[in-house]
Amino acid sequence: MCLVNEFVSNSNMKPALNVSGDEKELILQLRRYLEEKLTYLLDQNGTVSIGVSGGSMPRVFSKAILSLPQEQLNWKRIRIFMVDERNVDLDSEESNQGEYLRLFPNELRDVFVPMQIFKDPCLTAQHYEISLRKYLLPEQLNNTARFDILFLGVGPDGHTASIFPGKERLEKITELNWVSVITDSPKPPPSRITLTLQTLQHAKNVAFIICGKQKAEIVRGICDRDQKYPAAQARPFNDKLTLFLDEDAATGVPDRDSSDSDSPPPFDG
């Protein structure tokens, strides 16, 4: 299996950069991005599909989207999906979707498309893919879904979603499916469900939220398209990539002074 998807762009387009000094500024930048994208997408599409990750993202994403003028959002046309999840019960402290549900008001929890958890992670993945195919219009090419926006994080090893570095791990991920099972995650718990790299690459917009000096090297790898990092491979093939960074992570941006730092993301939905 080829580790680099055939749809990775060969263009030299740089990611759009948004660098923040603290979490408050980060949330404001995320809010601006969400407001622009959702305004456009809700005007153009029947529904809007958003994929979200775990870690610290539930807190900052929830604060950003819930701070938008609620009267301007048609929540019935917004669907939020998990990019990846640990195969644990919803009430577990390790559950990412459980954390999102705890942060969202009861009346808005229906925007989340649930990932039903089974003891067997393969069953969890199968049922989740069925749900995705029900809610998302598949891309004609390769029958692959196109999320409107994916919000991704990265680990200090360069993993994103639950796609960890290493040839053997990457080769276990079935690119023909939208969802894959991870049973040997280097981070506990070992069993996880994740969107595949091909699914990430087909998204219309991908936004990374990255903070910390220890991730500056990964930021450089993403900007330089260093394929040893899954996070770099997750760049969408249309190159609509936005990085939300703190000052420490931004030290990894090559030639930052001559880049499009703090510029608004490429915008046509």
Curated annotation (Swiss-Prot):
It holds the Pfam family Glucosamine_iso. GO terms for molecular function: 6-phosphogluconolactonase activity. It comes from Caenorhabditis elegans. Transmembrane segments: none annotated. Its main location: nucleus. GO terms for cellular component: cytosol; endoplasmic reticulum; nucleus; sarcomere; striated muscle dense body. Hydrolysis of 6-phosphogluconolactone to 6-phosphogluconate. This is Putative 6-phosphogluconolactonase. It catalyses: 6-phospho-D-glucono-1,5-lactone + H2O = 6-phospho-D-gluconate + H(+). The keyword rRNA processing does not apply. Keywords: Hydrolase, Nucleus. InterPro entries: 6-phosphogluconolactonase_DevB, Glc/Gal-6P_isomerase, NagB/RpiA_transferase-like, PGLS. Residues 248-269 are annotated as: Disordered. Its EC number is 3.1.1.31. It is found in: Nucleus. GO terms for biological process: carbohydrate metabolic process; pentose-phosphate shunt, oxidative branch. CDD domains: 6PGL (cd01400). Pathway: Carbohydrate degradation; pentose phosphate pathway; D-ribulose 5-phosphate from D-glucose 6-phosphate (oxidative stage): step 2/3. Belongs to the glucosamine/galactosamine-6-phosphate isomerase family. 6-phosphogluconolactonase subfamily. NCBIfam families: pgl (TIGR01198).
